[in-house]
Regions:
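Glycine-rich beta-strand-to-loop/alpha-helix junction loops that act as flexible
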Residues: 10, 88-92, 207, 325-333
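Short beta-strand-loop/turn "lid" adjacent to the catalytic site in phosphate-handling enzymes
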Residues: 71-121, 142, 148-157
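Glycine-rich phosphate-binding loop of actin/hexokinase-like ATP-binding domains
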Residues: 149-252
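Adenine-nucleotide phosphate-binding core of ATP-dependent small-molecule kinases
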Residues: 264, 271-275, 282-317
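Glycine-rich phosphate-binding/hydrolytic loop that grips phosphoryl groups
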Residues: 332, 354-398
Length: 398
C-alpha cells in the first residue's frame, strides 16, 4: 500500500487529494484558496468531516506547509514518510510530452518555457511543485499534462491555416486542454458499456466554466475544440471561444485598448457572462431563462449552437459515433443544458433520450439514452485526480 497525493494548483489556489493506492481510497481532499491575498481559506475533508479555516496564506509554500501539518495533526497519516509520491496537474506541456513523466531538471525547464502559452497556470504549477519538493524532499514527483492525451491528433486537426513558419518558429498549433478528464471519461464510459476502449468512437463533452469537446477514435484523440490556449473552442463561462479574429483588432481600435485589455475582455468578460449580462454561472443563467429574460434565453441558445456545431463536425470526422459522454460541472449537473443540446441533435444523430431520467441525474454515472438510440448517451463524472494518482504510482514503481 502506498499513499500518493494528487495536486492541482492555480495562481491563487491549491487543490489536493491523498490516495491510498492501489485501492484508490481517498483519505482526504481539500483546497487552499485566495493564496497571496490578504486573507486566505483552507478547507479539508476527512472521515466524513469538513473543516474550513480562514487564515493568511501568503504563498504556495505556506499553503503546502499548512496542508502537510494538517495531515499529521488530524491523524490522516502518522508521519509524512508514509507519502511516497506526488502527482501534479500541468495545464500546458505543448508537443513535448505525449504522456505523464517523472520530473527532473530538464522536464522542469521545458514546463517553464511553455509558461508563455499558459501564463496563469504553468508558473503556478512550478511554484507549487517546488514547494512540495522542499517540504517532501525524499519522494518522487510526476507531471501529468492536460495536453498529453491530445498528442495523437493528426496534422489536419492540430495545424492552423496561418503562415507555416508560425508553427516551426513559434509552436503555434492546437494543443487542447482537459486531456486528463477526456481520457478518464473515455475509458470509464467504455468500461460502463462493457466495450474495449480501443474499438470505440466517442465524443466527450467536458462542459464546465471552462469547456472543451473531444473526438476519440479507438482510444486516441482525433480532434479537440480548445486551441493554442484554453480560450479557443466553444463558448464558456467567461471565455468567448472561437470568433472571427478581425473582431479583436477592430475592437482594439474602437475602444483604444491594449492587448492586455483585450485579453481580459475575451478571457474574463465574454462567454455566458458577456451575452447574458448576468453571470458566468450556468445556474444563474438558467434562472434567467426560467424567468423569461431575453438575454438569458439567447445565452442558452448560443451555447447550444456552439456545442452542436462542434459535435456535428466531429461526428463526420469520426465516421460513426458509438457514444457521447457529458462530464464536468454543467455536463454532470445541468439537466436543462443537456436537454437543449440533445434535443438539437436528436434528429440528425438518431438519438432517443429518456428526458425524464435526464432531469433526475446530477453528478452520477448514468445511461440516459434509450435502447433504440443510434448513439448511447452517458453522464460520467470526471475524476482527474485518480488518473494523476494512477500515473504517479505507475511511473514511480510504487
Amino acid at each position: 500500500m502506498s499513499k500518493v497525493i494528487s495536486v492541482n494548483s492555480g495562481s491563487s489556489s491549491l487543490k489536493f487529494q491523498l490516495f491510498d493506492m492501489p485501492s484508490e481510497t481517498v483519505l482526504t481532499s481539500g483546497q487552499a484558496e485566495r493564496i497571496g491575498q490578504q486573507m486566505g481559506a483552507f478547507t479539508i475533508k476527512y472521515n466524513g468531516k469538513k473543516e474550513t479555516e480562514e487564515l493568511p496564506i501568503p504563498n504556495h509554500k505556506v499553503a503546502v506547509d499548512i496542508l502537510l501539518n494538517k495531515l499529521t495533526e488530524l491523524g490522516i497519516v502518522e508521519n509524512l514518510d508514509e507519502i511516497k509520491g506526488a502527482g501534479h496537474r500541468i495545464v500546458q506541456g505543448g508537443s513535448s510530452f505525449d504522456q505523464s513523466v517523472v520530473v527532473d531538471e530538464e522536464v522542469e525547464k521545458i514546463v517553464e518555457e511553455y509558461g508563455e502559452l499558459a501564463p496563469l497556470h504553468n508558473p503556478a504549477h512550478l511554484v507549487c511543485y517546488r514547494a512540495f519538493k522542499e517540504s517532501l524532499p525524499n519522494i518522487g514527483h510526476v507531471f501529468v499534462f492536460d495536453t498529453a492525451f491530445h498528442q495523437t491528433m493528426p496534422e489536419e486537426s492540430y495545424m492552423f491555416p496561418v503562415p507555416y513558419e508560425w508553427y516551426t518558429d513559434y509552436k503555434i498549433r492546437r494543443y487542447g486542454a482537459h486531456g486528463t478528464s477526456h481520457q478518464y471519461v473515455n475509458r470509464r464510459t467504455a468500461e460502463l458499456m462493457g466495450k474495449d476502449v480501443n474499438t470505440l468512437n466517442m465524443i466527450t463533452c467536458h462542459l464546465g466554466n471552462g469547456a472543451s469537446i473531444t473526438a476519440i477514435k479507438n482510444g486516441k484523440v482525433l480532434n479537440t475544440s480548445m486551441g493554442l490556449t484554453p480560450l479557443g473552442g466553444i463558448m464558456m463561462g467567461t471565455r468567448c471561444g472561437d470568433i472571427d479574429p478581425t473582431v479583436v483588432y477592430y475592437m482594439m481600435k474602437k475602444l483604444g485598448c491594449t492587448p492586455d485589455d483585450m485579453d481580459t475582455f475575451l478571457n474574463k468578460k465574454s462567454g455566458m457572462l458577456g451575452i447574458s449580462g448576468i453571470s458566468s454561472d450556468a445556474r444563474d443563467v438558467q434562472a434567467a431563462i426560467d424567468a423569461g429574460d431575453p438575454r438569458g434565453i439567447l445565452t442558452g441558445k448560443l451555447y447550444t449552437n456552439r456545442v452542436i456545431n462542434v459535435v456535428g463536425g466531429y461526428y463526420f470526422q469520426l465516421g460513426h459515433v458509438d457514444a457521447i459522454a457529458f462530464t464536468a460541472g454543467l455536463g454532470e449537473n445541468d439537466d436543462a443544458c443537456r436537454e437543449r443540446i440533445l434535443k438539437a441533435m436528436e434528429e440528425a444523430l438518431g438519438l432517443s433520450i429518456d428526458y425524464e431520467l435526464n432531469a433526475t441525474i446530477h453528478g452520477k454515472e448514468c445511461l440516459i439514452s434509450k435502447p433504440d438510440s443510434k448513439v448511447q448517451v452517458w453522464i460520467v463524472p470526471t475524476n482527474e485526480e485518480v488518473v494523476i494518482a494512477r500515473d504517479t504510482v505507475r511511473l514511480l514503481g510504487l
